[in-house]
């Protein structure tokens, strides 16, 4: 069985993500119906409990194991942590990222924490280094075009 894919979007609506996936040939409704695709609003995943997404991922990991799936892939936009600005939110973000294990105990979860480049630029160099897990996480820069918004993703 295929992996379960969780996409937690922040700057785009859930419907926009569905539309974009459909535009590149993904049969979104079939994937949602068979339980292999979940698309959520990241704000609702983090608020009011900042660990909401982690709890969802743990539940999906257990479900994947029960169903004999390969595992779970998680793509999460971290924009929530930049919503109100201030260093306190950056500190909360770094603590959140540090508490995310590179892999789950069963090794069946792979994750991408995605950052809008404008958000990422608000962090100082030491905060950026902490987010990268002192070299334990890989940094991937994604650019649509020279005029489009850029994004960063950390893979664990």
What do these predicted ranges mean?
Residues 1-156:
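Non-catalytic regulatory/interaction regions at protein termini and inter-domain linkers
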């Amino acid at each position: 069985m295929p992996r379960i894919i969780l996409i937690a979007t922040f700057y785009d609506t859930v419907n926009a993500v569905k539309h974009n996936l459909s535009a590149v040939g993904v049969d979104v409704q079939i994937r949602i119906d068979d339980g292999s695709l979940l698309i959520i609003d990241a704000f609702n995943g983090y608020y009011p409990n900042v660990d909401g997404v982690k709890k969802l991922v743990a539940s999906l990991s257990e479900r994947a194991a029960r169903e004999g799936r390969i595992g779970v892939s998680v793509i999460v936009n971290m924009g929530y942590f930049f919503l109100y600005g201030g260093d306190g939110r950056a500190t909360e973000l770094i603590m959140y990222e540090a508490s995310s294990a590179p892999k789950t105990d069963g090794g069946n979860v792979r994750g991408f924490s995605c950052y809008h480049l404008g958000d990422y630029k608000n962090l100082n160099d030491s905060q950026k280094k902490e987010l990268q897990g002192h070299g334990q996480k890989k940094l991937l820069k994604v650019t649509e075009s020279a005029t489009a918004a850029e994004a960063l993703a950390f893979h664990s």
